[in-house]
């Protein structure tokens, strides 16, 4: 006996030393020997496989001899080895699964709760240390694992009928990293979730009832997106209940694959037993940033029904109806949701609604769900975007039935709004489809005005209303809401657009009189209404002159005095004084009594003129070289027959050369006729570029003087008087160019 003990391998000795003597069923491994065994296998990883194989051999012997205590010690040793040697789990995990499978299949011991509980602890230790890298490509391990888990579920549920132990197994499976991403093992996730929900409904009957009732309309808006958990249905024993803990492990996770599978299992359960309390309770456990997935998957259930309708297959209207009700229940609950794509969900619900227009319950529930989407504000322009989207869809729909459905959807949303959330542009888009709800639309319109053109559309909207009572209420609301900015643009609008008496014109003046605080203005408006007359500008100027508000009075006077009211509404929306507006008609000034030629001479005789003063500048008019015929006519008639002045574009020296050549040719044709050729410098300069003036100022020649212009405080160029006795010199001689301006224009002689 001693000789056999001497030749026993060390790893077997260390394992055997961990087992206490005796046949007691509640044995525990020896602590010191177990610690040394753990140290041994941890420092010599090559011994792990030998230890695991020996444990299988020893367990097989213990099972055959019904040594329950030794089996319990083996299971505890396995749990400790897994926990301390998890880095090398792939070395021995298959042997451990084989060992546990031997225990489960032994009918003489698999009905012992103590043994199965220890086995569950060992299984949980393995699950917590499993990773996709261990089993991703190992088909043998996956097959063994699936077989073991299925057998474990069967033993616990059928032989032991232990619900808590079953829930513990579900919790163990939830700790496996990446199990939802593996196509061969992800079936375990919905199986565990359904098991936990069944247990929750069995223990708490309120989660099993059909409680889908239409929610009352909420006119009070919640604050912007909340991020803290709200109070939902409380369960007193939730913290200590394994079914609640199991659901927490599957739903309170950031693994989207696992969460997706878990929510699908929840929706499947809710289709058979619709219960909004169950939906709210579980949704509250989902991380707030991922709760929108519940709404998306419920919406997908509704879209599947719409696709079935399109393909011709029989859909389930009750399933779509329940899904819509569940969405509404979640949207109006106190559960916080962030990141919800409101427009995308609304468009999908609208598609189902229009495809199912024959089913009135489904159409109505779609409308309720769309309205509930706007129950919480996820971003500032949410309501406006929803209404704009409906307006665009209404304009594109040709079917009248579908158009009426969309208009009713729009009314349903508007009826649920209690705060100003739409702008004036959207208001003018909505009114043509909701003529009976003009007052309500005005009440939910923001006070901010984007621009002057918006006000014109606002007045036009009031003019398009057929009911006079509605017109009167609408105009009063407009003045109450935009009192500070509507008065002057309104005066400008009605002066420009109203040529014949109409009721809206008098409504404006009634409210304008109240705003200005002029009683006589109000009574005069009533007389004009009775007589069917319009105000003259002089009458309105009198009232604005006597206005209590001087700012309104001054701007109103300027509007009335301007020609054809050529003032932008944008200028009327600010507090700056208006810029003067000039009439396009000629002014009746003293210049108007002077003939055009005299006006031209007066302008030419001004001490300083720039290019902008005369359209015949040398830079903007094409230069014309004088011809011999022009000179002949000038000699005969004393003036040019053409109104266009003779100009030259050459330099001074080349210009003198050209003129000398022309003179010689002229003498040859008119022998003996002494003609007096006028020096170009005798005429006044018609236009000089500003840059040329600057050059002339920098190099003052003897032919120019500088005069200080008192009115403009700038140096003006005045050409010097040229002696009429000056004669041209031949081009062969050197010519000194004293003038620095190259663009003088010759006036007609």
UniProtKB/Swiss-Prot annotation:
Region annotated Disordered, chain positions: 633-652
Tree of life domain: Eukaryota
InterPro entries: EFR3, EFR3_HEAT-like_rpt
GO cellular component, one term: plasma membrane
Positions with biased composition (Polar residues): 637-652
One Gene Ontology biological process: protein localization to plasma membrane
Classification via PANTHER family: PROTEIN EFR3 (PTHR47766:SF1)
Family the entry assigns: Belongs to the EFR3 family.
Protein name (record): Protein EFR3
